[in-house]
């Protein structure tokens, strides 16, 4: 359901985007031109609807009901974030030209994209950043603008029907010509521009990430009356438009930084053809050291005759030429979303559409002239398919190291100088351990951590804080002084585990276990002939990895280390999107496998894991079958007195009854890394107790005596009660002894109030 819903969202690139382009910015800039409406607005009241699909609810979808046009419509939408951090880095200059960096808090979870249930061509683009819903709906080829009604105490909104015939766009064209493209090619060749190569192959429909750096010129800063907050607000509205325009190819544009020329333009901006190389040079000197990015664009409040922008073609991962210019002047404010999406298309390698290019409308996104259509043509798709495999930067999500986190009390992250951080004021009111000042409450010893209990106290030493997950994992216990559980440790790589497997990185890996994880408990490793037949092909169903964007055929000695091949598959599993199950039958042998192609953002279920047994004293490492003795470890079972196992730090984890560090003396078990359990023996302990020294247990001897005493006491009490009952019965008249219990009396009934939620089914 989620996949279907998201696919529908990605497919709905229709005329709504033109209206969104017009109306997104009319709320943040004083419009010199606006959409025309058909008649007066309707008053609507959005009502929250409980999502019936559990998958959609978990995926972050929410639904609202709106009644207009004589019928009820259900709007399903999902938040679209285009900032990697709420603390967006913003660079400005003072009067002396000194660069300053600020990290203002930016609300980024109030922009939504979605659709209207029951209409495959519908689309919704809404924001709640400014109170209520504001944005565009398209239903049955009709566009509507929605905005909060003011004043209103009942969440009322006004819904306007847009008159598409009266709403027109000003004719403009892109500054990129055939001659300009030829000059760009010569410039890049002369400059020996480095094109980052990628190992990503079939990226299609698995998402691209463009990390964008934006620069705002001085005229736009003055136009916003030197108010950086308004400039940031403008940029966020533009970002929503850009992402909507590029949804059809699953391109995510992420803003990593913003620079505002607050002290004048450092380069002339009047000539668009001179400005493009000048800006690229400026950014190389001034921007590269500030933030990481894939492309940088300059927003200029200047009219370049009839040109709306220009960019270098195919330079999205090129640090020298990865840039573009976008005009945001005068009545072109309402077209900025289209402009930036168009110029980013050039950065991605798309040229202007020719006469053979089509998208089902009169013109497409990459038309040389400005138009209302935002669909990509067949020519643009061909460019993406052919050239994006060589752009490694856009296949990677932004790294955590690229994201700055402002150290401040109240962000929910415990940082230097803080005892705790309960986050928002609402969370702090519910928190019994931490105060809004990021200090612990009176008598509280801790706030978070697996060794901090509900009373804000540190758990006693020996309290189990992390149970083992499997036979290759180890448990950890609190040490009594820290609120944190010790580091998550596991059994040393190379240790034998069930199924003729070996522990490796906390997993017991074997072909049978692997098949069961993918195809169910009845599945098992297929015949070696399957591995030989398929893994030597070198395709997405059988290979030994990738080199230079090509599948690698397995050598005969490595066939058991390529892709998993299974047999005895009773039922087909329900797998994530983009997986394909492959079945081959030859020479009375069945082989089941899954595919994986480069660019998929989900884990590969079918690659054989390191540590899997591939022969006597051989294991798979990096798709090669190597000798097991390649694991050289200082810790062995003999090191642990044969009373424990070695952990991944090559220290002994002792059995219950023996004490670390070497399991030579009696104790409670554990290790110097994981801690030790208390006197109580935990069922989650990983090792066997059979070798623990025997100790006399007094309780075992006392249990029979206690049981006999309890039984005798119960029998004595029962005999006394029976005797008294007989004496009382003998003293009653005969007629009373035979009277039915409810004779002459009305039975009583208890009235039970149903739960509140039953009142309104």
From Swiss-Prot:
Cellular component aspect of the GO annotation: external side of plasma membrane; sperm head plasma membrane
Domain Peptidase M12B, first and last residues per copy: 208-400
Molecular function per GO: integrin binding; metal ion binding; metalloendopeptidase activity; metallopeptidase activity
The record's account of how the chain is modified after translation: The prodomain is removed during sperm passage through the caput epididymis after the protein has reached the cell surface. Not processed in the secretory pathway.
Record topology, Cytoplasmic segments: 719-761
Sugar-bearing residue positions: 140, 227, 301, 378, 390, 479
Extracellular side: 35-697
Record-level GO BP terms: cell differentiation; prevention of polyspermy; proteolysis; spermatogenesis
Disordered as annotated region, ranges: 725-761
Entries under InterPro entries matching the protein: ADAM_Cys-rich (IPR006586), Disintegrin_CS (IPR018358), Disintegrin_dom (IPR001762), Disintegrin_dom_sf (IPR036436), EGF-like_dom (IPR000742), MetalloPept_cat_dom_sf (IPR024079), Peptidase_M12B (IPR001590), Reprolysin_adamalysin (IPR034027)
Signal sequence segment: 1-34
Propeptide position ranges: 35-200
Cofactor: how and how many bound: Binds 1 zinc ion per subunit.
Free-text domain note: The conserved cysteine present in the cysteine-switch motif binds the catalytic zinc ion, thus inhibiting the enzyme. The dissociation of the cysteine from the zinc ion upon the activation-peptide release activates the enzyme.
Protein name: Disintegrin and metalloproteinase domain-containing protein 24
